[in-house]
Amino acid sequence: MSKQTVALFFGGKSAEHEISIISARSIAAQIDRNRYELSPLYIDRDGKWHASECSQQVLDTDIAALLRSGTPESAGKRLDELTAAAAGECFDFGSFLKNTDVAFIALHGSYGEDGKLQGCLDTFGIPYTGCGLTASALAMDKVLTKLCAMNAGIAVAEFMTITSCAYMANPLETIVEITKRFDWPLFVKPASLGSSVGISKVRNAEELAAALENACGLDSKALVEAAISGREIEVAVLGNSDPLASEPGEIIPGSDFYSYEDKYIKNEAKIVIPADLPEGVAEEVRKAALTVFKALGCEGMARVDFFVENGTNRVILNEINTIPGFTDISMYPMMMAASGIGFAELVEKLLLLALEKRSITHKI
């Protein structure tokens, strides 16, 4: 039987560029080379697609070690060196279309997780892992995700949407409006970034102004959200029409909240899988994860994040990630492993789900 070619997309224009590379390295190590030919496809920070030689060199670079070396800027420097050396290479889009059987998308954040690439691949009839265009776009936007979840009966924290234009036009009025509506502390988040990029916990008006400046500089709108006193619980979901939910996992942050630095540089957070939850709460969280997954029209995979409120055990949606991390410290593969699906099997299932999804859409 001839091997199928898997195009592994990684890198990208988002702030999660390095994390995408780390995820791709983990995925590449688990792809069954007896069944698949791997064709790495690196997208640099400027959005340029690189030919296989440069892409393989980037994939071979241990970005995680560079990030944790104490000089994270060395990761960016190394990537710049590789792409500069490959400046004369020309990506052959025609060959890509002809030879690719299925795409594994390991891009996180904007221009990879938000539906843009999914729409491009749909146009050319290339099946791909994870959610389709619409679900990807909805899930990428934390505000739209909350509205869909509320419509499906899932609790969310009190929130308010601030457009970057409105804030820049009248920052003082925006801050006054927020302070009237919310108690301290609260969270400010870019509406469409992942890996906790740009998130701030604020305790006063001065910190609020700085947090809004930061979030609005990263995205076209910001989400202001009441702080929830509770445990951070996550669930991995896998499947198309009949998805399954994993054992829940718990993150115990090493700081005020599970920040980008906590996740990928300091690595101080404690992870507990399965989460030690009161009787009935674990099943409620799993059911809520499936409800959100279906409400958004997700396919393939997603990680759904919740709070379990202290004192009440109320299950409150935080967010959903349609292309969760696949690093060695990422919750999604670890929760699946705790549910009986190892990393290699998980990668294989995601590729098969992508092909299954394509076979269904081709009948329409």
Curated annotation (Swiss-Prot):
GO molecular function: ATP binding; D-alanine-D-alanine ligase activity; metal ion binding
Reaction(s) catalysed by this chain's protein: 2 D-alanine + ATP = D-alanyl-D-alanine + ADP + phosphate + H(+)
Main location: cytoplasm
Pathway: Cell wall biogenesis; peptidoglycan biosynthesis
Named cofactor requirement(s): Mg(2+); Mn(2+)
Binding site residues for Mg(2+) 1: 305, 319
Protein name, per record: D-alanine--D-alanine ligase
The organism of origin for this protein: Chlorobaculum tepidum (strain ATCC 49652 / DSM 12025 / NBRC 103806 / TLS) (Chlorobium tepidum)
